[in-house]
């Protein structure tokens, strides 16, 4: 983030651009890129229909990111290490890097914010993100 210009920015998730992402069915909104965040990863996923994949199944073995998911709208069904549970709006779900996780929308408009970084390390953008975002 630059030292010049405003010290804060704001936007509604619906105002953020969506980019193509073959990993999920929901709209991918690269929050980190929209705000120029360089200390942690941040992405939003907005489902258009019930059952859409909002968080792809994955484990953070390579980048070792701890991840926090925040359900901003609707309700998501998470499956983490084989345990399934519903997460209504306002739910926070924290995953250690070793957790095998995925989530689907239980209703249209379900919106999940994902925030992540590796503990104790300088943040590096995940390879999956750099492969899917336009060059700066």
Per-range role (PLM):
Residues 82-98:
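Short acidic-glycine-tyrosine-enriched beta hairpin
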Residues 2-13, 106-136:
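Double-stranded beta-helix
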Residues 39, 65-68, 109-110:
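Short, surface-exposed beta-edge/turn micro-motifs
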């Amino acid at each position: 983030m630059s030292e010049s210009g405003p010290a804060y920015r704001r936007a509604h998730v619906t105002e953020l651009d969506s980019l193509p992402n073959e990993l999920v069915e929901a709209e991918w909104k690269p929050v980190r890129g929209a705000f120029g965040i360089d200390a942690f990863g941040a992405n939003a996923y907005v489902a258009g229909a019930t059952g859409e994949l909002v968080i792809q199944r994955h484990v953070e073995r390579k980048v070792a990111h701890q991840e926090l998911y925040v359900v901003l709208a609707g309700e998501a069904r998470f499956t983490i290490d084989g345990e399934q549970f519903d997460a209504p709006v306002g739910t926070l779900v924290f995953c250690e890097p070793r957790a095998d996780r995925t989530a689907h929308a239980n209703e249209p408009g379900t919106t999940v914010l994902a925030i992540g970084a590796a503990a104790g390390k300088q943040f590096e953008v995940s390879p999956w993100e750099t492969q899917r975002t336009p060059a700066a």
